[in-house]
């Protein structure tokens, strides 16, 4: 680590410290969302081999993009993405204007993603308990919003146990799929539009921009552990995405 990295480590502002597994779990927990539900719909419109290499390609792209995000946050003391852009990309008289434009665009993107999660989660309550959709959305929002008050460390611990349980469930489901297969591996004619749609959904389903920034802070700017977390976390997320279509 050079002198600049050491200096940035000292300035890292974090409310809690994470273990490597907690950091990996935050990546996995934040990346696996409602988008994974749409993957099988798009996967069956491609051959299984196309799905495999597309998930692998999406993994490489995701790792590169999130390493860039991690470096931006790291170089600016663990700040959020928009603030990193302000420090690294925007200069001169238009700096504030570009920063606000980025804030609005990024904020809208997050709102769309969160809205999808709320609607998807609320639909489960509707199916289970027969609640009106608005009531289910409100309940899910309150439950999801309570995570903010738990703090980053408690969130990391919760994610650790959730991901461990998810690994067990996926392992059992995968074993059952191969031991008692109901269908052969599906094939479909190649079509570029179907492949691009699958790629877009896989990248969306495994994105974890905010989690990476929390990882940078939670690991106190330890570059080796940050890289290890990103490679491993997105590897597990890609594995989950690949298993679901089976």
Predicted regions and their residues:
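Membrane-interface "cap" regions at the ends of multi-pass membrane proteins
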Residues: 1-41, 46, 63-67, 153, ...
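Membrane-embedded alpha-helical segments of transport systems
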Residues: 30-34, 57-64, 104-112, 233-243
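Membrane-interface helix termini and inter-helical loops of multi-pass transporters
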Residues: 39-46, 118-128, 180-191
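Transmembrane-helix boundary/entry motifs in multi-pass membrane transporters
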Residues: 10-15, 22-23, 47-54, 68-112, ...
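Central hydrophobic cores of alpha-helical transmembrane segments in multi-pass inner-membrane proteins
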Residues: 34, 58-69, 141-149
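Short helix-coil transition sites and intra-membrane helix breaks within transmembrane domains
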Residues: 30-32, 73-77, 111-116, 202-206
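Helix-loop-helix junctions that connect adjacent transmembrane segments
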Residues: 134-139, 143, 153, 157-242, ...
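Hydrophobic alpha-helical transmembrane segments of multi-pass membrane proteins
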Residues: 27, 56-57, 101-112, 139-146, ...
């Amino acid at each position: 680590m050079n002198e600049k990295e050491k200096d940035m480590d000292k300035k890292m502002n974090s409310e809690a410290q994470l273990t490597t597994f907690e950091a990996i779990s935050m990546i996995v927990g934040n990346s696996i969302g409602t988008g994974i539900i749409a993957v099988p719909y798009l996967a069956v419109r491609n051959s299984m081999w196309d799905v495999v290499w597309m998930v692998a390609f999406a993994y490489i792209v995701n790792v590169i993009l999130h390493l860039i995000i991690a470096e931006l946050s790291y170089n600016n003391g663990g700040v959020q993405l928009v603030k990193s852009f302000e420090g690294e990309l925007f200069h001169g008289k238009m700096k504030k204007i570009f920063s606000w434009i980025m804030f609005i665009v990024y904020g809208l993107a997050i709102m769309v993603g969160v809205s999808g999660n709320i609607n998807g989660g609320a639909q489960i309550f509707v199916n289970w308990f027969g609640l009106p959709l608005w009531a289910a959305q409100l309940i899910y929002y309150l439950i999801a919003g309570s995570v903010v008050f738990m703090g980053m460390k408690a969130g990391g611990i919760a994610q650790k146990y959730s991901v461990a349980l998810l690994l067990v469930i996926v392992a059992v489901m995968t074993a059952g799929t191969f031991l008692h297969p109901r269908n052969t591996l599906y094939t479909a004619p190649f079509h570029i539009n179907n492949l691009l749609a699958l790629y877009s959904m896989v990248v969306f389903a495994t994105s974890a921009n905010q989690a990476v920034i929390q990882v940078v802070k939670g690991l106190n700017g330890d570059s080796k552990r940050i890289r290890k977390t990103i490679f491993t976390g997105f590897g597990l997320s890609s594995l989950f995405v690949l298993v679901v279509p089976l």
